[in-house]
Design a protein with these regions (language model features):
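N-terminal secretory signal peptides that target proteins for export/translocation
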Residues: 1-15
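Bacterial N-terminal signal peptides
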Residues: 19-29
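Boundary at the C-terminal end of the N-terminal hydrophobic targeting segment
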Residues: 33-37
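Short coil/linker segments at helix-helix boundaries
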Residues: 45-66, 89-127, 134-166, 180-232
């Protein structure tokens, strides 16, 4: 004779905490999603670690944190921002790699994968301009790495140009936009609106917007970085002007370190270069 299955029930003899614990375990096994606040908190923690690793120049941690965030990429509640910060981790891994003379192939792979993540972020949230800004920077760096391949350069330029123009139209007061546009102006010829002073003008505009509190959000999953990076680029630019302004370079670098004292690039690479140029 077949036995009837017995429905799951919690014995009344179990203590209340134990009953709740058993129920939570059962619900977890059934695939019930964790509360949004709990997931949000964990992602925010990982994002903070990513930004710290970026400033510290810790490329290994950036790779690991990119992978750690992958655990949340299927959560539709946070999919756009998870993709953004995964892309950010690889983007900054590549930028730090330039300072360490990492193999160009490795830099290219990181940047291409970052582009994919930023595209995912934009696909989920088309109005999230920061993903376009970051993707534009990655494409610009890929152009630099592809200088010996004119067809590849043309392909990347055709993609980066419209993307950054769209970002300018959508978010003209975003400080991070000016940080990304600056290098394109620095290296562009004068007859195309480029030049060293044009780039510095963009960085100053971005810094002014950052000081006004533009480009910030109450949600820590939305990017708010930018001011330290703009100060850093102003320091670098004044150091590398045709006629260097070393006092300005030093002042901007010190201001960046005041905001981020553990910034490896500014503290250990840029500041020594400025001091050497000053004859110290």
């Amino acid at each position: 004779m077949a036995r009837r299955s017995t429905p799951f029930k919690i014995s009344s003899r179990m203590t209340r905490p134990a009953s709740i614990a058993c129920l939570l375990i059962l619900l977890g096994n059934l695939g019930v999603a964790k509360p949004a606040s709990q997931v949000h908190r964990r992602i925010v923690q990982l994002v903070a670690h990513i930004q710290r690793a970026d400033y510290e120049g810790d490329r290994a941690s950036l790779q690991r944190l990119y992978e750690d965030l992958g655990a949340f990429q299927q959560d539709k509640r946070f999919a756009s921002r998870v993709a953004y910060w995964r892309g950010f981790a690889l983007w900054r891994k590549a930028l730090n790699g330039f300072n360490e003379s990492a193999p160009p192939k490795e830099l290219e792979e990181d940047l291409e994968l970052a582009v994919t993540e930023f595209e995912k972020s934009s696909a989920v949230d088309p109005g999230f301009t920061d993903a376009k800004i970051a993707e534009g920077s990655c494409l610009s760096n890929l152009i630099f790495l592809s200088q010996d391949n004119s067809a590849r350069v043309q392909e990347l330029v055709a993609k980066a140009g419209p993307l950054l123009k769209q970002a300018q139209a959508e978010a003209p007061t975003n400080p991070r936009l000016y940080w990304v546009l600056g290098p394109t102006r620095w290296y562009a010829p004068a007859d195309r609106g480029g030049g060293q002073l044009k780039a510095i003008e963009l960085y100053r505009k971005g810094l002014q917007l950052a000081d006004e509190g533009q480009g910030r959000s109450q949600d820590p999953l939305d990017p708010s970085w930018g001011k330290p990076e703009l100060l850093m680029n102003l320091a670098w630019s004044n150091l590398h002007l045709a006629t260097p302004n070393l006092q300005a370079a030093q002042a901007y670098a010190q201001s960046a370190l005041h905001l981020v004292p553990y910034w490896h690039y500014v503290r250990d690479i840029l500041m020594p270069q400025i001091r050497k140029a000053m004859g110290e």
